[in-house]
């Protein structure tokens, strides 16, 4: 099973990335709220085509998540169902490619939420805005960004984000994946 630290990180993903209305469950309206929040953060920089593509992706994501986690088939994914899904998933997950499809599809969407300039790289200012816009409790943003970039040796691009997201979800101990929660390891 998962240790308490892993459960805490999984709870963060549930609360922060999915349960947008904070009612303790994931439902269709949470995905609608995600689109609204995403548009607010990106200040209208989404084209209509991007918006439609993202909306279709979120609809697919919700179907896949429900199919994997909604044990009682009530069109609601509770925290307990979400945790049970992750306990099964993490037991066999060895890389990003082993993550559920809905989770893999979410990664570029989340990355775009940080990379508001659209240049494929999240710089310090964009990361600071991400922490502020999403109300992450980050005491020292530059220090956290330094961990993300390994002291400037690694570019904070989509591949780095994938690696950090995978580590956030699967690592049994504090490591660089915590930076996506605005925390140093």
UniProtKB/Swiss-Prot annotation:
Residues holding Ca(2+) 1: 19, 21, 23, 25, 30
Top-level lineage group: Eukaryota
Coiled coil: none
UniProt keywords, alphabetically: Calcium, Metal-binding, Muscle protein, Repeat
Gene3D superfamilies reported for this sequence: EF-hand (1.10.238.10)
Binding-site list for Ca(2+) 2: 70, 72, 74, 81
InterPro entries membership: EF-hand-dom_pair (IPR011992), EF_Hand_1_Ca_BS (IPR018247), EF_hand_dom (IPR002048)
Domain EF-hand: 5-41, 57-92, 102-137, 138-173
Protein's UniProt keywords contain Calcium: yes
Residues bound to Ca(2+) 3: 115, 117, 119, 126
A GO molecular function held by the record: calcium ion binding
Miscellaneous: The sarcoplasmic calcium-binding proteins are abundant in the muscle of arthropods, mollusks, annelids, and protochordates. This protein has three functional calcium-binding sites; potential site 4 has lost affinity for calcium.
Function, in words: Like parvalbumins, SCPs seem to be more abundant in fast contracting muscles, but no functional relationship can be established from this distribution.
Name listed for the protein in its UniProt record: Sarcoplasmic calcium-binding proteins II, V, VI, and VII
């Amino acid at each position: 099973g998962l240790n308490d630290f892993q459960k805490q990180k999984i709870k963060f993903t549930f609360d922060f990335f999915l349960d947008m209305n904070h009612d303790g469950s994931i439902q269709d309206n949470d995905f609608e709220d995600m689109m609204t929040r995403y548009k607010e953060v990106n200040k209208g920089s989404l084209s209509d085509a991007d918006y439609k593509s993202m909306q279709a992706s979120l609809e697919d994501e919700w179907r896949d998540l429900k199919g994997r986690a909604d044990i009682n088939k009530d069109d609601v994914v509770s925290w307990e169902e979400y945790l049970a899904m992750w306990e099964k998933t993490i037991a066999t997950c060895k890389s990003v490619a082993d993550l559920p499809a809905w989770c893999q599809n979410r990664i570029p969407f989340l990355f775009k939420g940080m990379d508001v300039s659209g240049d494929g790289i999240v710089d310090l200012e964009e990361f600071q805005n991400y922490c502020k816009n999403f109300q992450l409790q980050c005491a020292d943003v530059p220090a956290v960004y330094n961990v993300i970039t390994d002291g400037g040796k690694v570019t904070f691009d989509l591949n780095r984000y994938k690696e950090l997201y995978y580590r956030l979800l699967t690592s049994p101990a504090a490591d660089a994946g915590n930076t996506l929660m605005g925390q140093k390891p």
